[in-house]
Design a protein with these regions (language model features):
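Basic, glycine/lysine-rich polyanion-binding surfaces/domains
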Residues: 1-192
């Protein structure tokens, strides 16, 4: 089993009793599917349905908050975008990029861990507080990961994805869009 260090990614914690309902109105996938054992991907889009980011959403082990990760270059813009519509909702979004390491174990499918299909195969995400990582992982190099990503057909921000991309153009509707969940920013365009 190879491990991938995704710690450079932007990381956010979403808290408050309205966190699931609020985030569900901001992203293309059904946030109610998220659990401490399952991670989902979702698109953050403009009102015109164009991508503002592809994110991964999981739940912390205490089930008290949602954890989001995204491409590092989207750290500031996504923080602003995801916070933009908080008005009277009991929701707070915190940038925890510097507080956690994010490790993805390829080919791992332990039901007791946070399952994630980031690279089109079974895997597990581990959010680890900085300084708590235990040595011993068999790390995949950045070059090998990029080759693997391309072979698996996984789009990446700055390569196949940008702010002019509609989710369907990158086949993101296959696992990052739920057409039955209800309204979210950009939904009318994406559902056409």
């Amino acid at each position: 089993m190879k491990s991938v260090d995704l710690s450079k990614r932007a990381k956010f914690r979403v808290t408050g009793k309205d966190r699931v309902r609020y985030l569900n109105g901001q992203v293309s996938n059904d946030v109610r599917k998220v659990s401490s054992k399952e991670t989902i991907s979702a698109c953050v889009t403009t009102a015109k349905g164009k991508l503002e980011g592809l994110i991964w959403i999981s739940e912390d082990t205490s089930s008290e908050s949602l954890l989001i990760d995204a491409d590092p270059e989207l750290r500031e813009s996504l923080m602003m975008r995801l916070s933009k519509y908080i008005i009277s909702d009991d929701v707070e979004i915190f940038d925890v990029t510097e507080d956690y390491q994010l490790i993805h174990d390829l080919g791992h499918d332990d039901d007791n861990l946070m399952l994630s299909n980031r690279f089109c195969c079974n895997g597990v995400d581990r959010w680890i507080k900085v300084g708590d990582l235990i040595a011993g992982s068999d790390w995949m190099s950045d070059k090998s990961l990029e080759e693997y990503r391309i072979k698996q057909g996984v789009p990446a921000w700055g390569y196949e994805l940008n702010s002019n991309t509609l989710p369907q153009e990158a086949l993101l509707e296959r696992k990052s869009v739920d057409f039955h969940k209800g309204c979210y920013v950009g939904q009318e365009i994406i559902s056409r």
